[in-house]
């Protein structure tokens, strides 16, 4: 399964005059028809694809449980709380778990055994949380329709990517420029619907000049420019979660500042989910297009969007519950054609897209907790209106214990490397 992020292509935005009372009913009816049309168009042609994928997925109907003494996979099956497995699925998960030591041996760095802040290794080793490990491995297995060979290849690729990219470092040990921090927040609603408790928001209306943003923070920026921006960010942005400044390992960590910021946002959000809870083992994403004024997609944004989609698809499987596109201008339906034509999003993921040409989310998210601009309770007279940034929890998120061990190890390696260079 692919996890989707950003995307904007050629458009022209026409603002309608915020209507007279006499036309309000007609406008609301038109908007509702537009929402239905967009969602219908998005899902047209996908049902057969999803049905085909489902038909080919492994697993028959659950059979009666037998004793764990005769079926070792039954012990694994009992640890899974996010969903119900049949015996065949549990057997495959058991095989995948037992093969983890061999999988690690096939990676570029067998000592790197972390995914989403958890240690993925054999039972009995320090920091191995067996239920959470099993749930994470299940996501990789389910993403490939319970194909053990494909799941193994995906895991090897993910271990290698995490070892090289160091996403925990991006999330907890790097600072980013305020212009990037204003593009996204993380919210957590305790009373939210199932798997809508943790949400990452992408605020495209705050993207005032896409071309300049990606010249400064995208792949178009050279290393010297990125480092300079990171240093200036550390002086101007005191709200970051770490004392480090920017990509403080310089050229040793890959990716643009924009990419590292976006991956860091995802990693932080995952610290808030409970992989063993069927109601909170996935996150939602909301893309807000309010006040978007671009008339065409910037090439830098297009490249960054495709890169993020590919990274999420490979390395963050089965983690998206729903993706909302809100405040989408009536003329902006092209954006979903863009998502389909780039060819890196599965039909199953596209089915999770919901399109709204307004920002009223009170039917989906807790009204009492939402800002007024998203359909929440109006502020009392004289009280300042709450903004989405008032709900941002990203700076209070704590990393898992093993995640901290991984970062400490990375820091020790960097110190040793620097000492070797001095000597």
UniProtKB/Swiss-Prot annotation:
Its main location: cytoplasm. One of its GO terms (cellular component) is endoplasmic reticulum membrane. The keyword Cytoplasm applies. It is a peripheral membrane protein. It catalyses: a 1,2-diacyl-sn-glycero-3-phospho-(1D-myo-inositol)(in) = a 1,2-diacyl-sn-glycero-3-phospho-(1D-myo-inositol)(out). Residues 20-30, 54-72, 232-248 have a biased composition (Low complexity). Residues 1-76, 221-253 are annotated as: Disordered. Keywords: Cytoplasm, Endoplasmic reticulum, Heme, Iron, Lipid transport, Membrane, Metal-binding, Microsome, Transport. GO terms for biological process: Golgi to plasma membrane protein transport; regulation of exocytosis. It is found in: Cytoplasm; Endoplasmic reticulum membrane; Microsome membrane. It holds the Pfam family CRAL_TRIO. Transmembrane segments: none annotated. CDD domains: SEC14. Heme binds at residues 204, 262, 287, 289, 323. InterPro entries: CRAL-TRIO_dom, CRAL-TRIO_dom_sf, CRAL/TRIO_N_dom_sf, Sfh5. Its cofactor is heme b. It comes from the Eukaryota. Non-classical phosphatidylinositol (PtdIns) transfer protein (PITP), which exhibits PtdIns-binding/transfer activity in the absence of detectable PtdCho-binding/transfer activity. Regulates PtdIns(4,5)P2 homeostasis at the plasma membrane. Heme-binding protein that may play a role in organic oxidant-induced stress responses. This is Phosphatidylinositol transfer protein SFH5.
């Amino acid at each position: 399964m692919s996890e989707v992020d950003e995307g904007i292509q050629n458009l022209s935005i026409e603002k309608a005059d915020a209507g007279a009372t006499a036309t309000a009913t007609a406008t609301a009816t038109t908007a509702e028809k537009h929402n239905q049309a967009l969602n219908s168009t998005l899902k047209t042609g996908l049902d057969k694809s999803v049905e085909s994928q489902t038909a080919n997925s492994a697993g028959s109907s659950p059979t009666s449980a037998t004793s764990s003494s005769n079926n070792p996979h039954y012990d694994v099956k009992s640890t899974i709380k996010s969903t119900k497995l049949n015996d065949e699925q549990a057997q495959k998960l058991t095989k995948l778990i037992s093969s983890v030591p061999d999988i690690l041996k096939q990676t570029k760095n067998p000592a790197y055994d972390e995914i989403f802040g958890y240690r993925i290794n054999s039972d009995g080793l320090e920091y191995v949380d067996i239920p959470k490990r099993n749930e994470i491995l299940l996501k990789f297995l389910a993403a490939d329709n319970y194909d053990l060979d494909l799941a193994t290849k995906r895991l090897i690729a993910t271990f290698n990517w995490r070892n090289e990219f160091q996403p925990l470092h991006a999330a907890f040990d790097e600072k980013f420029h305020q212009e990037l921090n204003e593009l996204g927040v993380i919210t957590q609603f305790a009373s939210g619907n199932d798997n809508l408790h943790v949400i990452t928001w992408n605020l495209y209306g705050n993207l005032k000049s896409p071309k300049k943003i990606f010249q400064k923070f995208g792949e178009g920026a050279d290393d010297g420019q990125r480092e300079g921006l990171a240093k200036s960010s550390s002086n101007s942005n005191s709200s970051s979660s770490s004392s480090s400044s920017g990509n403080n390992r310089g050229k040793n960590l890959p990716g643009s500042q924009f990419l590292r910021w976006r991956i860091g946002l995802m990693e932080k959000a995952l610290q808030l989910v409970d992989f063993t809870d069927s109601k909170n083992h996935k996150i939602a994403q909301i893309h807000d297009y309010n006040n978007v004024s671009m008339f065409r997609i910037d090439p830098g944004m297009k490249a960054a969007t495709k890169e993020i989609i590919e990274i999420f698809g490979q390395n963050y499987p089965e983690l998206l519950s729903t993706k909302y596109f809100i405040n989408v201008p009536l003329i902006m339906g092209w954006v979903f054609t863009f998502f389909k034509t780039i060819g890196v999003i599965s039909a199953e993921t596209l089915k999770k897209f919901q399109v709204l040409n307004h920002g009223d989310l009170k039917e989906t998210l807790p009204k009492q907790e939402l800002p007024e601009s998203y359909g929440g309770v109006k502020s009392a007279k004289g009280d300042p209106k709450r903004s989405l940034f008032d709900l941002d929890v990203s700076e209070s998120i704590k990393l898992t214990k093993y995640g901290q061990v991984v970062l400490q190890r990375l820091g020790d390696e960097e110190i040793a490397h620097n000492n070797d260079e001095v000597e």
